[in-house]
């Protein structure tokens, strides 16, 4: 039973019923009646656009579609369908929520009837993108990159759908020799112009002793050639990227204009920051990844639950498909009772469902309920059930941040009482821990620790491996003995 979080709100398809459970609108592959505007206008209103290589009028004209029919099923019937792409270098075995911002832009284009193309940089990852970096990237092996590609593809299709065209630039780069590259690509670029680009200037500045290698200096030429290849083969005329990709994107636009006499444009997305100007996407110093083997659905969900009230409206616009009119009403309701965290819970459920599906949402909600809700009473070795919902309690606990400790040191060892263990993991003094114990403020598996000498016994272990230590409402430690 999921704990009731909110009360009494109905916003079109976003339904918070009187018992508090949230029902999220199903994923919609095409635009709704409330989103009839051009995709560029929608992106600007939602805060996605940092820079564009053409004026608003030109970009709107380029991406205009015939959406005059009120039947949602006909929204893909248009005369001006464009293909656009964004690149994702497989430098890790998962994308992160910074990449998700780019995927959301592509999703908006797709819902407006356009064709997104996801490019996996199997070739460019071997070179290393210098954009936004102060020193050379570590050179990656082909085997490492190949191992990452499968996970990156899964991240992409989770958001954009299995029907999305996903390409790997190793396909056309592996057969191009150096002479052909210099003649067919390099001849269209001038070193003077390349040096003037901001990301090159930053690496060549007096304050940067590392400089830039010739390998990374040529990166933008490879990315430009990717754009030209997609322009020729797939009619791709727009490239999407982060704000640090402006120089690489304009290089591609220039190559298409000079070599192919074509018209191509670029759009950059602002850096993802919170209201305090701090870069979003990390929790306790760790990146928030899209792949469940890197960030579990519970941890992913909790990241969004913990965003500040000041960031709620912006994140609703960026990471959900809720129409803007509904977001305004939702934010108003959120501000009336911010302690209910309606905005954060809406974001968390929408984004978790988008990335991990309904099962991921259920895993996250059940884990949250297990740790903080009424089902917390199940965190005892003698609980009446070993499951919550469809999930085994041991499995849910294994997906939470836990501390690993040596079993032989703390379990069935009378010389290592809970007092010592709690002091070690909390960095509190033993005198402070003694005060907490005397006031019955430390709980082992939801039962107050009885004395300073109480130690952990095998019979205390949940799912054979875990204990749950808690002090107050906000301080808890999940410990796994190995």
From Swiss-Prot:
Superkingdom per UniProt? Eukaryota
Residue ranges spanning the membrane: these are none
InterPro entries, A to Z: aa-tRNA-synth_I_CS, aa-tRNA-synth_Ic, Rossmann-like_a/b/a_fold, S4_RNA-bd_sf, Tyr-tRNA-ligase, Tyr-tRNA-ligase_bac-type, Tyr-tRNA-ligase_bac_1
Q: The S4 RNA-binding domain covers which part of the protein?
A: 416-480
Q: Which GO terms describe its biological process?
A: tRNA aminoacylation; tyrosyl-tRNA aminoacylation
Any one GO MF term held by the record is:
ATP binding
Query: What EC number(s) has UniProt assigned to this enzyme?
Result: 6.1.1.1
Q: Which residues bind ATP?
A: 89, 282
Localization recorded for this chain is:
Mitochondrion matrix
* Motif position, 'KMSKS' region: 279-283
What is the recorded function of this protein according to its Swiss-Prot or TrEMBL entry?
Catalyzes the attachment of tyrosine to tRNA(Tyr) in a two-step reaction: tyrosine is first activated by ATP to form Tyr-AMP and then transferred to the acceptor end of tRNA(Tyr).
Q: What is this protein called?
A: Probable tyrosine--tRNA ligase, mitochondrial
The beginning of the lineage is: Eukaryota, Amoebozoa, Evosea, Eumycetozoa, Dictyostelia
Annotated gene: mtyrS
């Amino acid at each position: 039973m999921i704990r009731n979080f909110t009360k009494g709100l109905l916003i079109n398809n976003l339904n918070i019923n009187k018992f508090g459970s949230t029902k999220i609108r199903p994923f919609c592959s095409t635009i709704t009646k409330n989103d009839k505007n051009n995709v560029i206008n929608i992106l600007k209103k939602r805060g996605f656009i940092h820079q564009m290589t053409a004026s608003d009028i030109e970009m709107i004209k380029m991406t205009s579609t015939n959406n005059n029919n009120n039947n949602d099923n006909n929204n893909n019937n248009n005369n001006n369908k464009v293909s656009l792409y964004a690149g994702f270098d497989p430098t890790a075995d998962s994308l992160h929520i910074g990449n998700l911002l780019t995927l959301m832009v592509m999703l908006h284009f797709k819902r407006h009837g356009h064709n997104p193309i996801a490019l996996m940089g199997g070739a460019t990852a071997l070179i290393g993108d210098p954009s936004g970096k102060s020193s050379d990237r570590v050179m990656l092996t082909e085997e490492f990159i190949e191992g990452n590609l499968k996970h990156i593809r899964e991240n992409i299709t989770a958001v954009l759908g299995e029907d999305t065209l996903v390409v790997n630039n190793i396909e056309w780069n592996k057969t191009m020799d150096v002479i052909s590259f210099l003649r067919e690509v390099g001849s269209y670029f001038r070193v003077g112009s390349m040096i003037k680009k901001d990301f090159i200037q930053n690496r060549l500045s007096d304050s940067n002793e590392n400089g830039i290698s010739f390998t990374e200096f040529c990166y933008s030429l490879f990315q430009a050639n990717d754009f030209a290849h997609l322009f020729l083969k797939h009619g791709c005329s727009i490239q999407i990227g982060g704000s640090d990709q402006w120089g690489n994107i304009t290089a591609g636009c220039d190559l298409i204009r000079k070599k192919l006499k074509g018209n191509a444009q670029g759009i950059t997305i602002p850096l993802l920051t919170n209201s305090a100007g701090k870069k979003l996407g990390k929790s306790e110093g760790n990146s928030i990844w899209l792949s469940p083997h890197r960030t579990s659905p519970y941890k992913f969900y909790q990241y969004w639950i913990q965003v500040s009230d000041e960031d709620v409206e912006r994140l609703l616009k960026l990471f959900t498909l809720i129409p803007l009119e509904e977001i305004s009403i939702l934010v108003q309701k959120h501000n009336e009772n911010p302690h209910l965290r309606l905005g954060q819970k809406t974001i968390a459920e929408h984004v978790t469902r988008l990335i991990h599906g309904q099962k991921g949402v259920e895993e996250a909600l059940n884990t949250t309920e297990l740790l903080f809700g009424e089902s917390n009473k199940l965190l005892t070795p003698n609980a009446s059930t070993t499951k919550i919902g469809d999930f085994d309690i041991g499995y849910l606990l294994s997906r939470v941040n836990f501390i690993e400790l040596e079993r032989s040191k703390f379990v069935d060892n009378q010389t290592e009482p809970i007092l010592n263990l709690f002091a070690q993991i909390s960095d509190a003094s033993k005198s402070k821990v003694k005060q907490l114990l005397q006031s019955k403020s430390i709980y082992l598996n939801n039962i107050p620790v009885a004395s300073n000498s109480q130690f952990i016994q095998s019979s205390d272990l949940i799912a054979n491996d875990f204990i749950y230590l808690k002090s107050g409402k906000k301080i808890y430690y999940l410990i796994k003995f190995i």
